[in-house]
């Protein structure tokens, strides 16, 4: 009844097979012990066989345990190597990505250099006259030159009036009123009740007639002689 576990199976299968064999041997051993002695069969011989099979199975189990330990250690090292390889792969991917970016940048620099070289060669083949360049620069200077500072330019006193203009007074008032041309405005406390403005009734002016026979002309213009003294002298 001796049983040898084949080493070709994986460790979990070998362990399960060994434990099953030991369970069967122990059940057979308990059956022999519990059964009454039979004179026709030798009980002692059967007990010795079961005991020997249990010893062999136990030795096989100890070997399997050692083998599983070595297997687990090898698997742990394999996992470490796998993680290390994954990290190296990420680094390699990053390096490849940066190399690709550098390659594109280098190609752009080469293209720009080739275009610059073509422009230089074209300018050498077709030089622009100095007069044309000066005329172009003078036409651009009207729009690109910086304005002359008022501190350096001569001051024309004839263009300034001895009194402030209306615009300067308005600008001064605008600065004082912080941007409002309509005055400071109404102020009040938040939540304060404001009285409604009273309506002012428009009253028509009463026309007084000096004489009942004369007609009142509102559009009449009266010219008064203010130089009465001069008229008297004349």
UniProtKB/Swiss-Prot annotation:
The keyword Nucleus applies. Residues 71-124 form a coiled coil. GO terms for cellular component: core mediator complex; mediator complex. The lineage of its organism: Eukaryota, Fungi, Dikarya, Basidiomycota, Agaricomycotina. It is found in: Nucleus. Residues 188-234 are annotated as: Disordered. Pfam families: Med4 (PF10018). One of its GO terms (molecular function) is transcription coregulator activity. InterPro entries: Mediator_Med4 (IPR019258). Component of the Mediator complex. This is Mediator of RNA polymerase II transcription subunit 4. One of its GO terms (biological process) is regulation of transcription by RNA polymerase II. Component of the Mediator complex, a coactivator involved in the regulated transcription of nearly all RNA polymerase II-dependent genes. Mediator functions as a bridge to convey information from gene-specific regulatory proteins to the basal RNA polymerase II transcription machinery. Mediator is recruited to promoters by direct interactions with regulatory proteins and serves as a scaffold for the assembly of a functional preinitiation complex with RNA polymerase II and the general transcription factors. Residues 189-217 have a biased composition (Basic and acidic residues). Belongs to the Mediator complex subunit 4 family. Keywords: Activator, Coiled coil, Nucleus, Transcription, Transcription regulation. The keyword Metal-binding does not apply. It comes from Cryptococcus neoformans var. neoformans serotype D (strain B-3501A).
């Amino acid at each position: 009844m001796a049983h040898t576990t084949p080493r070709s199976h994986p460790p979990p299968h070998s362990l399960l097979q060994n434990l099953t064999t030991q369970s069967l041997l122990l059940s057979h051993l308990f059956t022999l012990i519990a059964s009454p002695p039979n004179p026709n069969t030798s009980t002692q011989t059967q007990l010795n066989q079961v005991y020997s099979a249990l010893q062999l199975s136990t030795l096989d189990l100890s070997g399997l345990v050692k083998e599983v330990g070595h297997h687990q250690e090898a698997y742990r090292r394999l996992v470490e190597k796998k993680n290390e390889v994954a990290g190296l792969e990420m680094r390699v991917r990053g390096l490849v990505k940066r190399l690709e970016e550098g390659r594109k940048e280098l190609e752009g620099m080469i293209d720009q250099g080739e275009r610059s070289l073509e422009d230089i060669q074209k300018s050498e083949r077709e030089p622009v006259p100095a007069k044309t360049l000066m005329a172009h620069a003078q036409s651009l200077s009207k729009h690109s030159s910086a304005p002359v500072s008022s501190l350096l330019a001569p001051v024309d006193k004839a263009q300034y009036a001895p009194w402030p203009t209306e615009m300067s007074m308005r600008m001064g008032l605008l600065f004082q009123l912080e941007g409002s041309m309509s005055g400071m405005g109404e102020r009040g406390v938040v939540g304060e009740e404001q009285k409604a403005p009273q309506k002012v009734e428009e009253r028509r002016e009463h026309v007084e007639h000096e004489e009942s026979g004369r007609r009142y002309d509102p559009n009449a213009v009266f010219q008064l002689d203010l130089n009465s003294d001069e008229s008297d002298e004349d």
